[in-house]
Amino acid sequence: MRCRIAESDVELETPLVRAEVGSTLLIGIRAGDILLATVEPAGLSARNIISGRVLSVVQRDVIVVVRVNCGVEMEVHLTLAARDSLQLQPGHAVWLIVKTHSCHLMAAS
């Protein structure tokens, strides 16, 4: 099932749910379930590959919080090692990778 994020062009493939076309759904994605790539990925089973730009990279203890603008603002949690190997900086182009089953229906109306 394809769902458009409100007030954006971003679409996510989510698990099938019983919802009317045009319904409002609240979809939750854990920040730690989002992968980041610095080159456009190919040949993946993940159905959601979204391009964006890094807004900020902030270390909070042993977690790195990366904020990405991909038409909407998304928060991604990385390890220190992942941050270091990706060499992320604000303004860098990235791709967010989200498996369909990492998109959880929280509410529908």
Identify the meaning behind each predicted range.
Residues 5-10, 69-73:
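Glycine-centered tight beta-turn/hairpin loop motif at sheet-sheet or coil-to-beta transitions
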Residues 9-58, 65, 77-109:
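Glycine/charge-rich catalytic "coupling/switch" loops of P-loop NTPases
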Residues 1-2, 59-67:
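Short aromatic-glycine-enriched beta-strand elements
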Residues 2-5, 16:
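Short charge-dense sequence patches
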Residues 1-3, 23-24:
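Conserved active-site beta-strand-loop modules that form the wall/rim of enzyme catalytic pockets
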